[in-house]
């Protein structure tokens, strides 16, 4: 009989797909694996370019117990002229469908709302002739929508737009880093690689707050409370006892 581990699924777009890229510095994926090492398997299911329409379509084939971290909205929030845009109302409906599918499978869910966007960094990475189809205010609106769905369905939500901005010292009423009309030299340059995708500082904000949400809302899934699989090496009394521990 195989040694079975429960699973945490990281389900999202390119920000999740890149969450194991060691070039980013601190990485969300390996940090989650380390937190659940020898306790749960952490499965990466990141799909670059996907939006919540795509996610709602494929979630039924991806969900596994015990926990699914759902992070979509970055691509949904692009301007309506772009093919990947998903209107706010449909985005919220898609999140409701995803949460329902996860919960019907007997798993817990944590929603993650999109983080901020940095206009000048995006233009520098893609060239001035590249159509800039995003704004940080649109990203904020979709983060708000994710928070609204989480509150409605009573599932935890990690509002990355606010969490990253607050870590930069921003507060409501301040000028918003990342806007086209503000200087290119701003603190988001240390959190984003190209105006959209994350560097280690942003992934650390995500990790810290996902774990915080799990501890608060699903204490039974707190990695600090879950025992490791199999006895410690110096507690093994015999190979037969070890074999029995797997059964």
What is each residue range found by the language model?
Residues 2-7, 148, 152-154, 165-167, ...:
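Conserved catalytic region of serine esterases and O-acyltransferases that act on ester linkages
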């Amino acid at each position: 009989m195989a040694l079975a581990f429960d699973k945490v699924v990281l389900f999202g777009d390119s920000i999740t797909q890149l969450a194991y890229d060691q070039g980013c510095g601190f990485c969300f994926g390996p940090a989650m694996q380390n937190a659940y090492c020898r306790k749960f398997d952490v499965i990466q299911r990141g799909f670059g370019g996907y939006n919540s329409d795509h996610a709602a379509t494929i979630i039924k084939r991806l969900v596994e117990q015990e926990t699914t971290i759902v992070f979509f909205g970055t691509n949904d929030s692009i301007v309506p002229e772009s093919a990947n845009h998903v209107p706010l109302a449909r985005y919220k409906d898609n999140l409701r469908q995803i949460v329902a599918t996860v919960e019907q499978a007997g798993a817990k869910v944590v929603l993650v709302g999109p983080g901020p966007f940095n206009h000048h960094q995006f233009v520098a990475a893609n060239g001035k002739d590249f159509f800039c189809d995003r704004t940080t205010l649109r990203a904020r609106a979709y983060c708000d929508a994710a928070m609204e769905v989480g509150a409605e369905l009573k599932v935890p939500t990690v509002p990355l737009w606010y969490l990253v901005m607050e870590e930069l010292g921003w507060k409501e009423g301040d000028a918003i880093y990342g806007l086209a009309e503000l200087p290119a030299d701003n603190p988001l340059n240390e959190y984003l690689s190209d105006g959209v995708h994350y560097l280690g500082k942003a992934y650390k904000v995500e990790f810290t707050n996902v774990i915080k949400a799990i501890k608060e809302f699903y204490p039974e899934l707190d990695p600090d409370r879950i025992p490791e699989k199999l006895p410690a090496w110096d507690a093994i009394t015999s190979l037969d006892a070890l074999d029995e521990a797997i059964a």
